[in-house]
């Protein structure tokens, strides 16, 4: 089949009648004759729609249709300045008509008229001032409006200039794209249906004039006939198949798609602008992840490291400093985050002032041991706590709440023994007011001074309670005078510290003490927000046999309720129950209330802060982070202490350090902490107590196995061993010792450490002897003839040979004779013969010093 265009045919012929139609602009109409097989032809009317393009240097063709209005940005027209019209002067008031005077004229005005005129005059003055102020404000407002309009005009001009620049840039990019598309489109794509021979004619007729054909990229290029085209037209030929042109080969969809993609690539071939990002960097990150966060290729990052002299792989881990350097080099900004950011928002959440309500004060009772702290608290609570403590000594932190006259006060009782320094420090940090109990008959003692230091370090006010004033030797004035030395100035001495003389046994002045506490609390203006998640501090923790881990906590803000998810130190759990100081289960714990919390997964450390979180996932993340941090610190500590095996052995040999291993189990965490601190103080350069394991809870079979492996002794403080542990200890021959008073425990460990000390070598002087003559006896050797000048000389004692006040030899006597008889000792003033063991270099005039050596057992 071939197509011929009838537009160039000049043969005279009769053409059939055509329909009268209007020619559309931009359309070229012609007739194409199609030749089929067997000599058949077919005429087809073809309309070619041309798209107009403007090339550089072309003259615009006259438009056939009405021109379409084109938007052209107009230059900004400066707004006419607003001229503020001056306020017109008020027209003068019309002249008043003369008032006709009556026949009777008063010589002077009345007092009421004078007052009315005076008020009118003052009112006019006030109105004048107000008018001037309004005029000034109006002028200021007009100036501000003018300045605002000026800024708006400048902003409008700037936006219009930016819009013009943007339009010019878009037009330039569009022009470049069209030129690129025109350059790449082949010239043959113009005629989709023209024959090859018909294409040559216009080229010849045009001589040298170039023929410009504009094509659009969207027009599909006609398929060239292939060799096998005639072979495909086989089979039975029908009239329908002969007259239809469905057998013509069409362009495939994939070819059209490839052409469109090629055109898009040509359009978007311009260089892209690099996007700068904010890269979030953790403490460690891999190179691959860093490249993804920067939207860069990992190969480029590896190349950067190669330029710096480092050969790394995309999977290698780098630190935050190196990652920040790389990100900055690639032009990105960096925001570093730490692993500890997971704890952000856990504590110290700010509360609104309108949400705060008054709360009870938290009072800590501090002082020296046996000064009556717990007895004073008993008198306030009308209970008996001392009888429950072993030896009458407080060994735990007790938290109680007392209600007096409708107002609640929370008391925290701390131990006064020297071993419980950490407990006193924790009590001072969790309190609002510190009550310093000083016995009137004992005055200021070391733990009293330490309690003062803890209270000052915590920044809490002090109330001095001078106890035991009922005793005959009580001297409260002496207590006040000694407190001055430690910068505690009571009111009677001209200071600001409140002091109350009380007697815990007789209940004297307890009301005054409570009034002083409430007065100090009113001055402090203690408030908290109960309508939020709870926060506080762990006062004590223990492992109860029937209830599991139990933590005594003090709620400082918020309200703690059963079901809350609690995070305390390295442990977390869901609150199963809340128990108050009287052993009753409660539904909620408001601020400043001490409660026992059940439901934790482990025993937290005393002094840890606790907080309530939203879900278990966050609680687990926080505790895992803290546990990992604690493990890393422990590993670093042991790594620094361990060193190599040779160094450790040489250090032990040179120092001669002996260790006493112990496995300690206690009832509460605070007692374990106090025992550890007390045993650490017993250590010296020669011996020390090494605590293999310390924990809260009963003694178990695993503790016995650990003690057997390490050769340690087992100590139980207010706990007992179960049946399996006792059987295992009896089989292994390990002694288990039980204690209820920390004094006895420390004394026994001190005695055991003293037994590890090597005995002390102590010398006792016996006497001196002077050598008068040297005798050389056959088969015996040299014998020194001496006279005892001081003390006496004993056989078997240690001797030193001194010449010119210098010790020449130290050894023992081989023989001691008087005349020819062996004697055990020679008194002073007598002569004798002496010989040394394995030494004969003696001279006349030497001094022989005799002494006795004793080995004395040492104690710590």
Swiss-Prot record:
Residues 358-525 form the tr-type G domain. It is found in: Cytoplasm. InterPro entries: EF-G-like_DII (IPR053905), EFTu-like_2 (IPR004161), IF2_assoc_dom_bac (IPR013575), IF2_II (IPR044145), IF2_N (IPR006847), P-loop_NTPase (IPR027417), Small_GTP-bd (IPR005225), T_Tr_GTP-bd_dom (IPR000795). Its main location: cytoplasm. Pfam families: EF-G_D2, GTP_EFTU, GTP_EFTU_D2, IF-2, IF2_assoc, IF2_N. This is Translation initiation factor IF-2. The gene is infB. Residues 467-470 are annotated as: G4. Residues 392-396 are annotated as: G2. Residues 367-374 are annotated as: G1. Coiled coil: none annotated. It comes from Mesorhizobium japonicum (strain LMG 29417 / CECT 9101 / MAFF 303099). PANTHER family: TR-TYPE G DOMAIN-CONTAINING PROTEIN, TRANSLATION INITIATION FACTOR IF-2-RELATED.
């Amino acid at each position: 089949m071939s197509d011929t265009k009838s537009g160039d045919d000049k043969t005279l012929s009769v053409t059939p009648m055509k329909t009268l139609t209007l020619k559309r602009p931009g359309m070229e109409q012609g007739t194409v004759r199609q030749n089929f097989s067997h000599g058949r032809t077919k005429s087809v009317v073809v309309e070619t729609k041309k798209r107009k393009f403007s090339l550089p240097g072309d003259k615009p063709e006259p438009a056939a249709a009405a021109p379409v209005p084109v938007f052209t940005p107009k230059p900004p027209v400066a707004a006419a300045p607003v001229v503020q019209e001056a306020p017109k002067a008020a027209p003068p008031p019309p002249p008043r008509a003369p008032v006709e005077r009556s026949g009777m004229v008063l010589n002077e005005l009345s007092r009421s008229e004078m007052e009315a005129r005076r008020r009118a005059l003052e009112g006019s003055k006030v109105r004048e001032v107000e008018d001037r102020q309004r005029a000034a404000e109006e002028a200021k407002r007009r100036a501000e409006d003018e300045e605002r309009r000026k800024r708006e005009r400048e902003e409008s001009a700037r936006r219009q200039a930016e819009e013009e620049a943007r339009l010019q840039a878009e037009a330039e990019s569009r022009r470049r794209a069209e030129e690129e598309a025109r350059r790449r489109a082949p010239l043959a794509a113009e005629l989709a249906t023209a024959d090859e021979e018909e294409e040559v004619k216009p080229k010849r007729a045009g001589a040298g004039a170039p023929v410009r054909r504009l094509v659009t990229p969207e027009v599909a290029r006609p398929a060239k006939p292939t060799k096998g085209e005639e072979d495909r037209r086989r089979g039975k030929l029908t009239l329908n198949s002969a007259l239809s042109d469905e057998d013509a080969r069409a362009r495939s969809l994939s070819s059209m798609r490839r052409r469109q993609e090629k055109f898009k690539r040509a359009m978007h071939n311009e260089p892209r602008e690099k996007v700068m990002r904010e890269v979030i960097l953790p403490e460690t990150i891999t190179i691959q992840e860093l490249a993804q966060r920067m939207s860069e290729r990992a190969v480029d990052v590896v190349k950067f490291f190669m330029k710096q002299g480092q050969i790394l792989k995309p999977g290698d881990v780098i630190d935050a400093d190196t990652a920040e350097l790389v990100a900055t080099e690639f032009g990105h900004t960096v925001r570093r985050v730490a692993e500890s950011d997971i704890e952000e928002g856990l504590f110290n959440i700010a509360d609104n002032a309108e949400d705060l309500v008054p709360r009870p004060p938290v009072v800590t009772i501090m002082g020296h041991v046996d000064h009556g702290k717990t007895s004073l608290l008993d008198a306030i609570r009308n209970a008996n706590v001392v009888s429950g403590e072993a030896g009458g000594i407080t060994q735990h932190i007790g938290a109680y709440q007392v209600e007096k006259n409708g107002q609640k006060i929370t008391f925290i009782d701390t131990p006064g023994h020297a071993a419980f320094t950490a407990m006193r420090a924790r009590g001072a940090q969790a309190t609002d007011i510190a009550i310093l109990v000083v016995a009137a008959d004992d005055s200021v003692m070391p733990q009293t001074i330490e309690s003062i230091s803890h209270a000052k370090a915590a920044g809490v006010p002090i109330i001095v309670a001078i106890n035991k004033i009922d005793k005959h030797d009580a001297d409260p004035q002496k207590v006040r005078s000694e407190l001055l030395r430690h910068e505690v100035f009571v009111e009677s001495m001209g200071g600001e510290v409140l002091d109350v003389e009380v007697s815990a046994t007789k209940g004297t002045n307890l009301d005054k003490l409570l009034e002083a506490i409430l007065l100090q609390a009113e001055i402090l203006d203690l408030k908290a927000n109960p309508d939020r998640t709870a926060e506080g501090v762990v006062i004590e923790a223990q492992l109860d046999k029937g209830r599991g881990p139990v933590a005594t906590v003090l709620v400082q803000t918020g309200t703690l309720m059963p079901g809350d998810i609690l995070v305390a130190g390295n442990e977390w759990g869901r609150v199963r129950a809340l128990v108050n100081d009287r052993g009753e289960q409660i539904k909620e714990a408001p601020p400043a209330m001490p409660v026992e919390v059940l439901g934790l997964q482990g025993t937290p450390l005393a002094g840890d802060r606790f907080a309530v979180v939203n879900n278990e996932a966050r609680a687990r993340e926080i505790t895992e982070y803290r546990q990992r941090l604690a493990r890393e610190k422990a590993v670093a500590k042991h790594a620094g202490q361990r060193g190599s095996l040779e160094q450790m052995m040489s250090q032990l040999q040179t120092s001669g350090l002996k260790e006493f291993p112990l496995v300690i189990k206690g009832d509460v965490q605070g007692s374990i902490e106090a025992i550890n601190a007390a045993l650490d103080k017993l250590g010296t350069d020669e011996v020390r107590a090494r605590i293999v394991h310390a924990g809260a809870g009963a003694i178990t079979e695993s503790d016995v196995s650990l003690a057997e492996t390490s050769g340690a002794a087992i100590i139980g403080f207010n706990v007992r061993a179960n049946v399996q542990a006792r059987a295992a200890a009896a089989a292994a021959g390990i002694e288990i010792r039980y204690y209820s008073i920390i004094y006895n425990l420390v004394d026994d460990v001190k005695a055991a450490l003293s037994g590890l000390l090597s005995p002390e070598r102590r010398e006792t002087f016996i006497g001196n002897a002077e050598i008068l003559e040297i005798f050389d006896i056959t088969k015996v050797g040299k014998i020194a003839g001496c006279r005892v000048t001081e003390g006496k000389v004993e056989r078997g004692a240690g001797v030193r040979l001194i010449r010119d006040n210098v010790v020449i030899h130290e050894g023992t006597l081989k023989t001691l004779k008087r005349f020819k008889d062996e004697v055990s000792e020679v008194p002073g003033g007598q002569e004798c013969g002496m010989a040394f063991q394995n030494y004969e270099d003696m001279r006349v005039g030497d001094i022989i010093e005799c002494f006795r050596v004793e080995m004395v057992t040492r104690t710590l």
